[in-house]
Amino acid sequence: MTETTKTHVILLACGSFNPITKGHIQMFERARDYLHKTGRFIVIGGIVSPVHDSYGKQGLVSSRHRLIMCQLAVQNSDWIRVDPWECYQDTWQTTCSVLEHHRDLMKRVTGCILSNVNTPSMTPVIGQPQHENTQPIYQNSNVPTKPTAAKILGKVGESLGRICCVRPPVERFTFVDENANLGTVMRYEEIELRILLLCGSDLLESFCIPGLWNEADMEVIVGDFGIVVVPRDAADADRIMNHSSILRKYKNNIMVVKDDINHPMSVVSSTKSRLALQHGDGHVVDYLSQPVIDYILKSQLYINASG
C-alpha cells in the first residue's frame, strides 16, 4: 500500500497520568510500531489527555502538576503531544466526549474528513472549511503541495494551543487548488484519518464491569472510533473481550498489540511509581523519566500515602 492509501492514525490516550510513567510512553511507541508493521496504518501523532481534577480518584494531584509532568515526559518526542482540553473543562468529561472533541478538532485544524471505523468515508477530502474570504490551509500560490502526514501533524501542533479549548462545529471540507497555469480544479490525493483510543488491558477489562461504562458510550468508542490495546502484565486481551457483548460485537475494531509479552515496561504503573516515591525506592528511575522525577521532588508530590 502507498502512503496515501494507508489509514492515517492519531493515537489518543486518556487517563489520570498520576504520574505519567515510562510505561505510558512505551505504550505509544509499541502501538505505533505494531500498527506500522501491519502495513495498513501510518501513525502521524499521539495525544496524551490527562483527566479532569473532578474525576475524584484518591491521591490525584492537581491537573496543573500532571500537565507539566506529561509535558516533561514527552518533551523529546517528535510525535506525541499533551492536550489540556480535558483538564480545562468545567467538570469531568467522559472518554467518549474526549474522543468526539478531538475528532471535531482535527476536522477544523487539518481539514480532513475523519471517518468512523464502521462507516469509512469513500472520498475523504483534504482542505479548509468553506468560509468566505479564507485561504485553504495548505494552499500556496507559488508551489502547489500535497497535505502529507507530516504537514497534518505540523498543522495540529501549530493550532492546538490556540483552539484546543474550543469545541468547533462539525463541517464538511473541500479543497480547491487555484492554480492559474492549469486553470482547472484539482483534488489532492485522498487521505483517510482516524483517531483511535490507546489503552492498556486494564481499561479494556473495565469495559466488562457491569454498570461502570455507559453502553451507548461504549458503542461509540469501540464501534465508531476503535481501540488499540497494549496488554500489561501478560494479560489475555482476547479472553477479556469474550466477557463483554459489545467488545465481542466490535472485536474487529479492537487491535491488540502482540509484540514482546515480557516487555519490561509492561509491568510499570503509576501506582508502583507512587509507592516507590513514598518509600524512597531507587527503582523509581526505572519507572519515571528523570525530568519527571526532578519535578516531583521539587514540588513535593506523592511524598505521603494520600498522594
UniProtKB/Swiss-Prot annotation:
Q: How does it sit in the membrane?
A: Lipid-anchor
Q: Which residues bind NAD(+)?
A: 16-17, 92, 95, 200, 202, 212-213, 232
Q: What is its EC number?
A: 2.7.7.1, 2.7.7.18
Q: Which cofactors?
A: Mg(2+)
Question: GO CC terms for this protein?
Answer: axon; cytoplasmic vesicle membrane; Golgi apparatus; Golgi membrane; late endosome; synapse; trans-Golgi network
Segments traversing the membrane: none
On whether NAD is a keyword of this UniProt record, the answer is yes
Task: Tell me which UniProt keywords the record has, alphabetically.
Answer: ATP-binding, Cell projection, Cytoplasm, Cytoplasmic vesicle, Golgi apparatus, Lipoprotein, Membrane, NAD, Nucleotide-binding, Nucleotidyltransferase, Palmitate, Pyridine nucleotide biosynthesis, Transferase, Ubl conjugation
Q: What does this protein do?
A: Nicotinamide/nicotinate-nucleotide adenylyltransferase that acts as an axon maintenance factor. Axon survival factor required for the maintenance of healthy axons: acts by delaying Wallerian axon degeneration, an evolutionarily conserved process that drives the loss of damaged axons. Catalyzes the formation of NAD(+) from nicotinamide mononucleotide (NMN) and ATP. Can also use the deamidated form; nicotinic acid mononucleotide (NaMN) as substrate but with a lower efficiency. Cannot use triazofurin monophosphate (TrMP) as substrate. Also catalyzes the reverse reaction, i.e.
Name listed for the protein in its UniProt record: Nicotinamide/nicotinic acid mononucleotide adenylyltransferase 2
From which source organism is this entry?
Answer: Rattus norvegicus
